[in-house]
């Protein structure tokens, strides 16, 4: 922000990471965990107070329509093994549909995030802007600006992953975004 605005707004110190993942849902959490396991210092930014994304926010209590491979598949299997909801009246487990309670999903994801010492979770912190370096037709996102506890904070990293589900980071960065078909 311009210098005159900086005087009226309180800023937290700038933080630097190797990877910033915006969106702590079904796409962002596996991305953050795998980056941390590879040795990267990761900021996982979530606008909501709880992690989980749409399965928690909108009570979407089934995972479908996404590839179930790698870490996502392992998390899904653990979730369903420990917390899956089935139709026990019929005595059979369903094929295709996999239901769970959002609270169980939050517990599973939170536990897996806490296991990774290289992840800094910043929940309740909406992204309010992006920092973009102009490189002609190859602009590069170098960081995000978040609103945290009544203060603004800038996070920088060589890699920023937009896992918001809505493409808000891409849109804020000037990318052409299309929704639907």
Predicted regions and their residues:
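Extreme N-terminal leader/targeting segments of oxidoreductases
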Residues: 1-19, 107, 122
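N-terminal Rossmann-like FAD-binding beta1-loop-alpha1 element of flavoenzymes
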Residues: 19-43
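Short hydrophobic core segments
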Residues: 22, 155-165
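Conserved beta-strand-loop-beta-strand element in the redox core of flavoprotein oxidoreductases
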Residues: 131-154
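Glycine-rich loop(s) and the adjacent beta-strand/alpha-helix scaffold that form part
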Residues: 162-181
């Amino acid at each position: 922000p311009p210098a005159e605005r900086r005087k009226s707004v309180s800023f937290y110190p700038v933080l630097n990471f190797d990877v910033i993942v915006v969106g702590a849902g079904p796409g962002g959490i596996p991305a953050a965990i795998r980056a941390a396991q590879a040795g990267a210092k990761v900021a996982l930014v979530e606008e909501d107070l709880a992690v989980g994304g749409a399965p928690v926010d909108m009570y979407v209590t089934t995972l479908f329509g996404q590839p179930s491979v790698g870490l996502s598949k392992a998390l899904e299997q653990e979730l369903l093994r420990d917390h899956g909801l089935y139709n026990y009246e019929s005595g059979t487990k369903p094929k295709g549909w996999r239901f769970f309670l959002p609270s169980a999903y939050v517990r599973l994801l939170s536990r897996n995030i806490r296991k990774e010492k290289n992840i800094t979770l910043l929940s309740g912190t909406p992204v309010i802007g992006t920092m973009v370096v102009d490189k002609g037709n190859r602009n590069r996102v170098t960081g995000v600006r978040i609103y945290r506890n009544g203060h603004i904070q800038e996070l920088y990293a060589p890699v920023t992953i937009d896992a918001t589900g809505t493409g808000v980071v891409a849109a804020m960065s000037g990318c052409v975004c299309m929704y639907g078909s």
